[in-house]
Amino acid sequence: MTATNELLQDLKARGLIAQCTADEELAEHLSTDCRTLYCGFDPTADSLHIGSLVPLLVLKRFQQAGHKPLALVGGATGLIGDPSFKAAERQLNTNEVVGDWVNKIKAQVSAFVDFTEEKNGAEVVNNLDWIGQINVIEFMRDVGKHFSVNAMIQKESVKQRIDREGSGISFTEFSYMLLQSYDFAALNKAKECTLQIGGSDQWGNITGGIDLTRRMNRNKVFGLTLPLVTKSDGTKFGKTESGTIWLDSNKTSPYAFYQFWLGTADADVYNFLRFFTFLTVEEIAAVEESDKSVQGRPEGQGILAREVTRLVHGEEGLASAERITKALFSGDLSSLTETDLAQLALDGLPSTELEASEQTIVEVLTQSELAKSNKMAREFIGNGAVSVNGEKVADTEAVLKKEDALFGKYSVIKRGKKLFNLYIWK
């Protein structure tokens, strides 16, 4: 069995194939040579979020099987906005904003695939390089003539927008399918790209690209979609009460990222291990079986958090996340670095900025809502339930001082076992 056949079987076993065109032909096509595939990532923000992890990791899986991945960053399509299954029209951003996002996303994508000199070395491409070179007349004549509006409005992704009362769809967004389809034809011609992958919401755009490539280039190409990740409780994957989980450590810290995966529900964890890690399906099945047979805390969440944090933030990011987690649990903060505390300030703990040079602990507890009243704050202190930077506070008249802050900037207040507030001295 070839590496490619093993890959396709593995993708199926992981539940990573939603739809596929001509699956038997695709398997044969991939098994005969190093093939080039691509996935597009439109810059809708200055960072990718964890919703992009599945396609990024599938690009990596294909590369490991000997194929050449192209990560397309949509410098052109990002200026338009994909209407697929969106309730309303996206806000249009300026060329400068999108251009800046393109550069940041290029750097992020580069962390997931290998840019070797080998035949299957990865590349990052920007569709502004070819879409920006074609004028309107050429586009209408060479691309537009191959599309039937009758067929386009029957695409489920477009149909939902047209049928939604008070919404509709602009010609700008309606034309998105043509641009994405042209990407496939352009990459097929320039890079001999024969496979496009994407989320299952991209099926209409991908099949449009397959048809356009056949018409323009007279070439047979393929499409494969990946399932959109859902949670068993019906809530949206990748969102928390505090917002989106980003891949950029300046937007979501490695610690918060690690904690997100650690909080995965038992009903989701083994599915997520199949989607987001490179553990074999047999290894994942063994973890699941072990968790079922052993009473107490399951191992699945810890394995998932470690594997995905290592993939996105490297060994250093994982070590930091585990160090912070252990320190907060034990109450011993002596191992924390200034960078660790900056992570907690970003999104790890509720935080309060202090401008005064000192403040009583009682005031600190009530202001941070760790105590509902001064009386209750004193009771907590008297019961030994309050600590500052890992040291128990016994005196109800104790004062929090900037000179005692960690690295001259941070004071970690803990009440009980799990309630924290981070004071940041200005």
Curated annotation (Swiss-Prot):
Alphabetic keyword roster: Aminoacyl-tRNA synthetase, ATP-binding, Cytoplasm, Ligase, Nucleotide-binding, Protein biosynthesis, RNA-binding
Localization per record: Cytoplasm
Molecular-function GO term, any one: ATP binding
Pfam families the record matches: SYY_C-terminal, tRNA-synt_1b
SUPFAM superfamilies hit by this protein: Alpha-L RNA-binding motif, Nucleotidylyl transferase
Record text on subunit structure and interactions: Homodimer.
Protein name: Tyrosine--tRNA ligase
Gene behind the chain: tyrS
